[in-house]
From Swiss-Prot:
Family annotation (InterPro entries): Ribosomal_bS6, Ribosomal_bS6_sf, Ribosomal_S6_plastid/chlpt, Transl_elong_EF1B/ribsomal_bS6
HAMAP family membership: Ribosomal_bS6 (MF_00360)
Taxonomic path: Bacteria, Bacillati, Bacillota, Bacilli, Lactobacillales
An annotated Gene Ontology molecular function: structural constituent of ribosome
Gene3D superfamilies with a match to the protein in the record: 3.30.70.60
GO biological process, any: translation
Name of a matching Pfam family: Ribosomal_S6
GO cellular component: cytoplasm; ribonucleoprotein complex; ribosome
SUPFAM superfamilies from the UniProt entry: Ribosomal protein S6 (SSF54995)
Protein family according to the UniProt entry: Belongs to the bacterial ribosomal protein bS6 family.
Keyword Chaperone tagged: no
Gene of this entry: rpsF
Cited function: Binds together with bS18 to 16S ribosomal RNA.
Protein name per UniProt: Small ribosomal subunit protein bS6
Entry keywords, A to Z: Ribonucleoprotein, Ribosomal protein, RNA-binding, rRNA-binding
Length: 96
């Protein structure tokens, strides 16, 4: 299984319940498509290097994933691009 790290930035003005639902939804997208979520944790609110969609801060969330193929990652990528609550995301393959 290949290991991946996913980092995404959530808009800072989201309510706590909505943030938790968003994180749970995107974790389930990964698991429903065959990936295993090893760790999913929220960093704190951090200042952005530059303004994104009129926001100067964002809530950083990091997910460590193991997957046999990239189907789960492609689905995560596709859905995070169209979700207004996610400002940016990045998927990195970890060399073992």
């Amino acid at each position: 299984m290949a290991k991946y790290e996913i980092l995404y930035i959530i808009r800072p003005n989201i309510e706590e319940e909505a943030k938790n639902a968003l994180v749970a939804r995107f974790d389930s997208i990964l698991t429903d498509n065959g990936a295993t979520v090893v760790e999913s944790k929220t960093w704190e609110k951090r200042r952005l290097a530059y303004e994104i969609q009129d926001f100067r801060e964002g809530l950083y969330h990091i997910v460590n994933v193991e997957a046999n193929d990239d189907a789960a990652l492609k689905e995560f990528d596709r859905l995070s691009k169209i979700n207004a609550d996610i400002l940016r995301h990045m998927i990195v393959k970890i060399d073992a």
